[in-house]
Structures are given as C-alpha cells and as structure tokens.
C-alpha cells in the first residue's frame, strides 16, 4: 500500500484529537513512510513535538483551518465550511533549515505546496505562520473565548429559571462555543496552556479594572466599551478584507 501512496504523491491529513496524534503518526511511519503529512489540530506546538520525536519533520507541514462550529459529527457537515476561512500553514522546518545554512528538502517543499493547493481546493486562504506565533494568536482569539463562554454559561445558569428564560441574543452569541463537547475544549485549552494563561492574565487585568470602575461612586465602563468597540472594528475590517478578496 505504501508504494501506491508514494506513486500517487499522497498527502495525509491528520484530523483527530490531540491525544490520538501520536498513534496516527506511528501508523503513518509504518504504512506510509514516504508520504507528506499535514494536520488540522488547533494547537501546533504539541503536534510538531510529536513529529520531531519521530524524525518526520522533513515531510510535515502543520495546518489549522479557522473554521468550524460547536457541533460535530457527520450530521453537522457543511459543504462550504472552509470557504474564505483563514488556514494557518506552518513553515518552521524551512526557516530552521535556512538558519542553519542547509538546503530545504524537495519533499518538504512539495508537501508545503500540496497543503497550499488543498486550501485552494476548498476555497480557503493560506496564511503562512510560525508555530509559536500561531499558538499565541489562537490562545487569544479561539481558546480564551472558549474559557469565557464556559464562565458566562455557568454564571447565567446560576441565575436560575428567570435568567435562563430571559437569555437571548447577546448571551447566546457569547456562549455559543460552550456547546462544544467538553473533552474537545479541554484538550484544546490544556494543550495550549502556556499561551492561554498569558492571554487569560491580560483579560483578568481588564476585568479587575472594569470591576474597580463599576464599584466606584461614579460607575463607568466607558473606557472599556470604547476600546472594545474599536478593537472589534479593526478585527472586522481585517476579516472582512479576507472575505472580499
């Protein structure tokens, strides 16, 4: 079978929870030792470490499509899920080769090219990125929102039947990802704990400041609401430009 994969220049996409990545890599090492490899796992440092431990870095290019919903399973499949989505593609191995003055292996270049081609096939937009930068960024815009969604859901639920009955747009928007299967959230956040803690500390500083200002003789969150509005406007402008491209 491995000869068939080699002749077809196969690209293997690892799409499993982080806890199963090592087992899948071992199977690839045994059955498809010459195939290019990518993945769609939401944390890149941990996956790359598993790849490095097995000496498979010259045929691995990490990937992460910024798409998905809180639902999972075949029944929740979406035909255009990746359309206009940013798709992070890592290039650490190439950068390290260049830093050492070494030639980048042809297989890695071909694998990188195939990963980019795959993103084009599903109408996503490739974003070259270093592993550490990826994990730091998604800690802020993906993993921290999961933590806050869980917190908001718990606080809202603690309000009892009345709060539950009155919950509507803003609450449901803010807690949507709390509907994600708990094990998936745990693996995602715990695997990226160092970067997530840094983002969480920044968020806690903002929360403490907001609390102090609300607990003053003249309560105000003007500074926070203005900063949040401007930040969201910048984010919308950036993602909007991608959608219109």
Place the predicted regions along the sequence by residue.
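Long, positively charged, glycine-interspersed low-complexity recognition regions
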Residues: 233-245
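Short, small-residue-biased leader/transition segments that mark boundaries at the very start
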Residues: 1-5
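N-terminal Rossmann-like NAD(P) cofactor-binding module of classical short-chain dehydrogenase/reductase
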Residues: 12-13, 38
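Short glycine-/small-residue-rich Rossmann-like dinucleotide-binding loops
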Residues: 16-18, 41-42, 65, 152
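Interdomain hinge/lid region at the active-site interface
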Residues: 161-232
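Rossmann-like NAD(P)(H) cofactor-binding subdomain of soluble oxidoreductases
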Residues: 24-75
């Amino acid at each position: 079978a491995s000869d068939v994969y080699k002749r077809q220049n196969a690209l293997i996409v690892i799409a499993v929870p982080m806890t199963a990545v090592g087992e899948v890599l071992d199977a690839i090492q045994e059955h498809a030792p010459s195939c290019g490899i990518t993945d769609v796992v939401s944390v890149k440092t941990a996956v790359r470490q598993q790849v490095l431990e097995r000496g498979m870095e010259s045929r691995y290019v990490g990937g992460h499509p910024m798409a998905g919903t809180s639902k999972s399973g075949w029944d929740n499949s979406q035909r255009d899920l990746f359309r206009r989505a940013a798709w992070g593609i890592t290039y650490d191995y190439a950068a390290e080769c260049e830093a050492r003055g070494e030639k980048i292996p042809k297989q890695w270049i071909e694998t990188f090219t195939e990963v980019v081609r795959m993103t084009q096939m599903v109408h996503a937009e490739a974003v070259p990125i270093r592993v550490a930068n990826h994990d730091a960024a998604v800690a802020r815009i993906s993993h921290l929102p999961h933590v806050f969604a869980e917190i908001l859901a718990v606080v809202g639920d603690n309000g009892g039947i009345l709060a539950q009955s009155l919950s509507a747009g803003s609450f449901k928007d803010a807690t949507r990802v709390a509907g994600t299967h708990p094990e998936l959230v745990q693996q995602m956040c715990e695997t990226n704990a160092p970067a997530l803690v840094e983002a969480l500390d920044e968020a806690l500083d903002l929360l403490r400041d907001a609390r102090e200002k609300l607990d003053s003789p003249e309560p105000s969150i003007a500074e926070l609401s203005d900063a949040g509005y401007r930040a969201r406007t910048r984010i919308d402008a950036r993602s909007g430009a991608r959608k219109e491209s």
